[in-house]
Amino acid sequence: MLSTRTAAVAASASPASPWKLGGRSEGGASCDGCRTYRNTLRRRAAPAKVRALPPRRVDAVAMVSNAETETEKEQEEAAAASEELPVMPWATSVASGYTLLRDPHHNKGLAFTEEERDGHYLRGLLPPAVLSQELQIKKFMNTLRQYQTPLQRYIAMMNLQETDERLFYKLLIDNVVELLPFVYTPTVGEACQKYGSIFGRPQGLYVSLKDKGKVLEVLRNWPHRNIQVICVTDGERILGLGDLGCQGMGIPVGKLALYTALGGVDPSVCLPITIDVGTNNEFLLNDEFYIGLRQKRATGEEYDELIEEFMSAVKQFYGEKVLIQFEDFANHNAFDLLEKYSKSHLVFNDDIQGTASVVLAGLLAALKMVGGTLAEQTYLFLGAGEAGTGIAELIALEISKQTNAPIEECRKKVWLVDSKGLIVDSRKGSLQPFKKPWAHEHEPLKTLYDAVQSIKPTVLIGTSGVGRTFTKEIIEAMSSFNERPIIFSLSNPTSHSECTAEQAYTWSQGRSIFASGSPFAPVEYEGKTFVPGQSNNAYIFPGLGLGLVISGAVRVHEDMLLAASKALADQATQDNFEKGSIFPPFTSIRKISAHIAAAVAGKAYELGLATRLPPPSDLVKYAENCMYTPVYRNYR
């Protein structure tokens, strides 16, 4: 369940015991042998002895209650060592002492008080100093800034997440603008490329072809039962970097870290998953450190059967209200999966729907600067994949709702260019299904420049994944027939961006309204400083996810995406516009996410898709109260 602010305050005032349930949540199912084994341990645990001893002697209780078996265990282990037989990996049932310091959910580093150190057998296991959470954040930031490369900072942050979860999230929330590029894009792309080399402690859950027929058992191995948000990838299209196979795990791990830090979703209800069906990346297949299956990527029936088993197992094990976010699937699977499961599961594709929602928000905000409506603009895209067609469809949908015109007519305002040129009606026979709605009557054009000159768009959007394709002549052409050309260079990472912020402002003589997918530094042009907006999906998906969770939504509806876009656009202020930015600053992202969550939840209640009844009277306040707050708790 989501923590509430009230509960967080109560928790900080009322000490709690750092329970550790043997590596599995108490409700977790397992094989008959394991259940028998745990039941035997419970029978030996002698409740009367537990009540007879002081509360702080929990570890002593465990030792007393199992004293009768200690010699037996030692004999078994000695025999196993000599005979090379398997041994039972014994673990304490309460996080205390050495174990507590290595439990990321309960570890507080040097913030354990003197009383906690005595009560939980930490005396001598820590240096004498007691440092507050705030001071530990200051210390870690000082260390982080001394690293020379973004990847070093990424590794340090991931190590912190695996050792002190609350410090990790507090650090990220308090320094979100500085740390976001290291936790997610663009650094996460390099991390995925080198994931095998930097792999330490495993994060998330791996489902592979080896698990076919046993996916439900794999899900049961995860220690938490109350999962509400899953981010899953098959690693075939990681950012703009292509097929990284099993090493794509960095994406769902990073994505869910942002669900928590930016959207306030409790980390214990989040589950990152990678589905490993092989890879066609020859470099990885020949890399001795590659962590995935060493085989070509499965396709067709074999692939579909594993995905179907996975989706069925998730719904069976976690219920209908668990959000499944598809992440970085290749085009040929992404659209099919979204269409197939959107009617039976709570599913969301960030590459298609999340990108579209944040770009639509940027356009709505940009129109506040230039005037006019969505229907009065002409849109030209470079790139016709998941992102490009997803954005185009949401724009057409919003135009349709604003004008009451058929969506087929509204699509005619939007033009797309792919690797073969302008998508036109004469190409329909060779087009992929998701491109066909955008094939309009026009003469064939081979280049983006020709398309710009012919169509004369007011909005130019790049989702091609190919860097430096918005050339000087293209931006100058855009500026020649638009007083304020709107230019979105959305491809990630930075090296793949269609143009830089400096190029957009310089080549348009400071007149363009610019946004990018990757962050760019402020640009000075003729005495004015422009702060480029980052059209980052992280503006949308954390708040969207929170809204779905707090309302108990059972399906994602397109109207929820439109509501999220409008809520984000409303957060941009005149002060942002004067600096050239169409997005609000990330420093207020939790406030932004609360408003987006409220808008999404409100739409869920309006559409009859919410199950948490009755609806709260103040959805914004309710969303804020439901947000996870990563402050250290006191332990009794």
UniProtKB/Swiss-Prot annotation:
GO MF annotations, alphabetized: malate dehydrogenase (decarboxylating) (NADP+) activity; metal ion binding; NAD binding; oxaloacetate decarboxylase activity
pH-activity note: Optimum pH is 7.5-8.0.
CDD domains per UniProt: NAD_bind_1_malic_enz
GO terms (BP aspect): malate metabolic process; pyruvate metabolic process
Annotated site (Important for activity): 351
Cofactor(s) essential for the protein: Mg(2+); Mn(2+)
Effect of residue 339 to A: No effect on kcat and Km for NADP. Increases Km for malate 2-fold
Residues at the active site: 184 (proton donor), 255 (proton acceptor)
Location of this chain's protein in the cell: Plastid, Chloroplast
Pfam annotation, one family: malic
UniProt pathway: Photosynthesis; C4 acid pathway
Bias-annotated ranges (Low complexity): 7-18
GO CC, alphabetical: chloroplast
Quaternary structure and partners: Homotetramer.
Role played: The chloroplastic ME isoform decarboxylates malate shuttled from neighboring mesophyll cells. The CO(2) released is then refixed by ribulose-bisphosphate carboxylase. This pathway eliminates the photorespiratory loss of CO(2) that occurs in most plants.
Protein name: NADP-dependent malic enzyme, chloroplastic
